[in-house]
Amino acid sequence: MKVSYHGHSVVKIETEGKTIVIDPFITGNGLTDLSVDDLKVDVILLTHGHNDHVGDTLQLAKQNDALVIAPFELATYLSWKGVKVHEMHIGGAHQFEFGHVKLTQAFHGSSYTEENQTIVYTGMPSGILFTAEGKTIFHAGDTALFSDMKLIGERNTIDVAFLPIGDNFTMGPEDAAVAAEWLQAKTVVPIHYNTFPVIEQDPVAFAESLSGKKGRALAVGEAIEL
C-alpha cells in the first residue's frame, strides 16, 4: 500500500490496484500537486461536507465513475447530484472489495455552501479508519481533541494517522500532539495547515515535537510505503 499527501487534507491511497482519495479539495487548493482533469480515482472517501473537503468530488466521481463513501446525509445529497454513493454513519463499518472502512466521530461541523450562498446541512462530521493489506490508516478529518481518541488507539493498531494541526477551525499543534499520544499510531502526519493564513503552522516543528520520532511532515506529493 502507498499513501501520499497532497496539500490541505487530501490523502491518496493506492492499494490492490485501486486508487482512493480522501477529501479531494483540489480546485482552489494552492498547495496541491494534483490536477482534477488528470486524476484517476476509483473511490472517494469524505469526512464531512465542508467545501474544502468535498472539493472536486462531483467532477472526479462523474469523470471516473468513482464510488463516493460518506456520512449518510452528505452521501444522500451527492447522490441527488448524480454520483454513485455508499452511505455510512459514525460507528459503522463496511468491508469493500478494496478494503475495510469505519467511520469514527469527529468534533466539528458539516455543511455545504452552494454557489447561491445556500448552506446545506450534511450530517455529522467523521474520521475514517481504512484498513487494507493488513495496514490501517486513520484520517481524523477536521476535529477538536476528544478523549475517545484513546479508545480509537486502544482498539486499533494504526500504522499512519493524519491529524489536523491548523488551529482556529480544528485542533492546533498542542492538542494534536496529545491526540498522537492517545492514538498510539506508528507514524503521525500533520494535515490541514498553511492553505489559508488563519491556519498557518510549522509542520516540521510539530513532527519533531512528537515523542518516539513518529512524527513525519510529508512534502506535497510525498508518499509512505506500507
Curated annotation (Swiss-Prot):
It comes from Halalkalibacterium halodurans (strain ATCC BAA-125 / DSM 18197 / FERM 7344 / JCM 9153 / C-125) (Bacillus halodurans). Belongs to the UPF0173 family. It holds the Pfam family Lactamase_B_2. One of its GO terms (molecular function) is hydrolase activity. Keywords: Hydrolase. The keyword Hydrolase applies. This is UPF0173 metal-dependent hydrolase BH3178. InterPro entries: Metallo-B-lactamas (IPR001279), RibonucZ/Hydroxyglut_hydro (IPR036866), UPF0173 (IPR022877).
